[in-house]
Amino acid sequence: MSNEKASTKAPKFAYPSKKKYCIFCSEKIDYIDYKNVERLKRFMTEKGKIIPRRISGNCARHQRQLSTAIKRARYMALLPYVVK
């Protein structure tokens, strides 16, 4: 009489995922402009949240610049804080 249950979950990593790369490094962009709203929208969810680095594939430097640019654009009312 053991209390162990049979595991029916699939393995978490069934296949190796594709290597993500920083779009800004590949295009050799040094400064992310907060006025370029179309580029910033690509790194936000439909609810207006910033997509994390592990999903977007950005390097640490550009992810910091990206979050600062999005926050500046929100403050200047170029991007919404929350989308309903």
Swiss-Prot record:
Belongs to the bacterial ribosomal protein bS18 family. The keyword rRNA-binding applies. The keyword Transcription regulation does not apply. Keywords: Ribonucleoprotein, Ribosomal protein, RNA-binding, rRNA-binding. This is Small ribosomal subunit protein bS18. GO terms for molecular function: small ribosomal subunit rRNA binding; structural constituent of ribosome. One of its GO terms (cellular component) is cytosolic small ribosomal subunit. Part of the 30S ribosomal subunit. Forms a tight heterodimer with protein bS6. One of its GO terms (biological process) is translation. Disulfide bonds: none annotated. InterPro entries: Ribosomal_bS18, Ribosomal_bS18_CS, Ribosomal_bS18_sf. It comes from Dictyoglomus turgidum (strain DSM 6724 / Z-1310). The gene is rpsR. Binds as a heterodimer with protein bS6 to the central domain of the 16S rRNA, where it helps stabilize the platform of the 30S subunit.
